[in-house]
Amino acid sequence: MYESEIESFRAEVMQLNDYIADNPETGSEEFKASKAIVTLLRKHGIDVEFPFNNMETAFRGTINRGKSKKFAILAEYDALRGLGHACGHCASGSISVFAALILNELRESIDAQIDIIGTPDEETKGGKVYMVNDGVFNDYDAAIMIHMFNMNAVSMPFLALDSYEYIFYGAPAH
């Protein structure tokens, strides 16, 4: 299923991953990574806003602009200071690009707008937080992303991904 589309981009995405891994940049300093990603997306005909949302290293690439259904693929590409890509954002960001390239190839059969959004500075300030506060995601039906882990899973019980409500009973102590 879609094997030819997958194979057609494999080498370029692997090169992208290796380039980002070999050139780790910490939050809001992902100039090489964001430029490499944007260059690859544009090479394959994806319209890209760069920089995006008043963030120098953020971008948004759009496939099938103007469709009523809207989906976002999020891409992270920042590194950890002193540790490089120990969190694997070189790989997860590249996989998001891989998905966008394949979906762009299949765009005629997709009745939805698909945006790939580069979300810088995930490790420190949280670039997605600024985007949420600015309403970037308000008009999307869904947003997805991938993150590296030591096993395959559709979902994981992370505090940052789950919603919890706490109710405290008693009298103030101070």
Which residue stretches match the model-derived regions?
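Acidic/His- and Gly-rich active-site-bordering loop/insert found
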Residues: 3-112
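Histidine/acidic-residue-rich, glycine-tolerant segments that coordinate divalent metal ions
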Residues: 57, 78-84, 90-91, 110-174
